[in-house]
Regions:
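Small/aliphatic-rich secondary-structure junction motif
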Residues: 1-55, 134, 147-215, 229-232
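Redox-cofactor binding/interface segments in oxidoreductases and associated redox assembly factors
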Residues: 6, 111-112, 154, 237
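Short glycine-rich, flexible loops that bind phosphorylated cofactors or substrates
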Residues: 13, 118, 243-245
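Short secondary-structure boundary segments
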Residues: 36, 113, 238-240, 269-270
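A short acidic, glycine-rich active-site loop
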Residues: 54-69
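Structural beta-alpha unit
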Residues: 76-109, 205-235, 239-255, 263
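Hydrophobic alpha-helical segments and helix pairs
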Residues: 85-142
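Short, flexible loop segments at boundaries between secondary-structure elements
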Residues: 262-270
Length: 270
């Protein structure tokens, strides 16, 4: 049984992320822990990011009421769908350190706030950006509207992080590894796939329906164009968290994929 965290920010309730959790539970029973995070003052966020103890921000009455409604809804839906669940809350004032601790004791974190997706690349959703940057387990970003993945896309660039993501996904979700899978490498100037034999030897043991594909041209644009044609797929990537915190989602190609193509994205970074 996997322990899955489902994070809710503010008064939002992600139908997409919950639906994804339900689908996982049907394939292999999970423990679903709902983590309910209240909104905080941005100054406290940045105080935490630079190591300054944040001030306590009291919750407004409407925030408390919205959180209570979300918790009740979460528990009712879990009971209706036969999902074993727990609720973690009471993060008054500043929840990011607590969410980071939660991820330390979880297998995977699901995030599906529509507000989060709308802000990718447009404005900085500081709150959830900090949460993702500090996550100590793999993260699944879930669009609100999607079809449960029937194919896997392994984004490979020869880096240790891309190999790490492939391994983490296969360990966590063996039930999804039987889906048709393509390992994609974007080449420049007729480059060979880095350590081709080794990566094929590893990936083919976990993904029996594996194909390898090379895309030419500028890696960012060729991959973006190709993935726009893919449907019902899940992207597995290690390319997260390489940029400075303040620029993370502006520079990460993963955020572009989530924002533009609304594919579920599995991210694992060391």
């Amino acid at each position: 049984m996997k322990k899955v965290l489902l994070a809710f920010d503010g008064d939002s309730f992600s139908e997409g992320a919950f639906e994804f959790a339900c689908s996982l539970n049907k394939k292999d029973q999970i423990l679903l822990t709902g983590v309910f995070i209240s909104r905080v003052d941005a100054k406290n966020l940045w105080a935490y990011s630079v190591g300054v103890p944040p001030a306590v921000v009291p919750l407004l009455e409407e925030d408390i009421e919205a959180e209570s409604e979300n918790i009740e809804r979460f528990e009712d839906l879990c009971n209706l769908n036969n999902i074993t669940c727990k609720v973690h809350k009471d993060y008054y004032g500043f929840a990011i350190p607590e969410l980071k601790r939660e991820t330390k004791f979880a297998d995977v974190l699901l995030i599906g706030s529509e507000t989060f997706y709308n802000n990718l690349g447009l404005g900085i959703n500081d709150y959830m950006m900090n949460a993702l940057h500090g996550a100590e387990c793999p993260v699944l970003l879930i669009p609100e509207s999607f079809i449960f993945p029937q194919r896997n896309i392994l984004a490979y660039d020869g880096s240790d992080s891309s190999i790490y993501a492939i391994k983490q996904f296969s360990y966590l979700f063996p039930e999804l590894c039987d889906n048709p899978t393509v390992l994609v490498y974007c080449e420049e100037e007729n480059e060979e796939i880095p350590e081709n034999e080794y990566v094929y030897e590893l990936a083919s043991q976990h993904f029996p329906k594996l194909k390898i594909m090379k895309l030419g041209g500028d890696p960012k644009w060729s991959f973006r164009s190709w993935i726009g044609e893919q449907q019902n797929a899940l992207l597995i990537s290690g390319a997260f968290g390489r940029s400075p915190l303040s620029q993370l989602f502006r520079k990460s190609f993963v955020s572009d994929i989530v924002k533009e193509h609304r594919l579920p994205v599995f991210i694992a970074h060391r």
